[in-house]
Regions:
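Glycine-rich beta-strand-turn "strand-cap" elements at beta-sheet edges
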Residues: 2, 39-48, 76-95
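Short, well-ordered beta-strand segments in beta-rich or mixed alpha/beta enzyme
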Residues: 2-8, 39-65
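N-terminal first-folded block
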Residues: 3-30, 35
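Generic alpha-helical hydrophobic packing signal
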Residues: 3-9, 21, 51, 55, ...
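Short phosphate-engaging motifs
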Residues: 14, 48, 70
Length: 95
């Protein structure tokens, strides 16, 4: 299993638009083969920080997701709504 934790920094004026785009991404992704979990959260202390938590059956399933047309479309469209590149951590469970 592969876990991804991605942290994005949103602009306040475009937060709702980016959340809508993220909702579309989640709705499509959870149907994708190999996706175990794909959730979006807002930081309680800073609502302009969004955290995506993903779990995939394998690295191959994750790669299929990140190479998909819909993923590239939403990521490229969302670039104008974030203040810096997302922090992405690809993790493996150790305990």
């Amino acid at each position: 299993m592969v876990t991804v934790i991605a942290k994005s920094y949103l602009t306040e004026e475009n937060r709702e638009r980016l959340l809508e785009m993220s909702k579309q991404l989640v709705e499509i992704t959870v149907k994708q083969e190999g996706c175990i979990r794909y959730d979006a959260y807002l930081d309680e202390n800073d609502p302009n920080i969004m955290i995506m938590v993903e779990e995939w059956e394998s690295k191959e399933a994750l790669n299929n997701h990140t190479n998909s047309d819909y993923y590239h479309k939403i990521v490229s469209e969302s670039a104008e709504y974030i203040t810096q590149m997302p922090e992405v951590h690809i993790c493996k469970k150790v305990l």
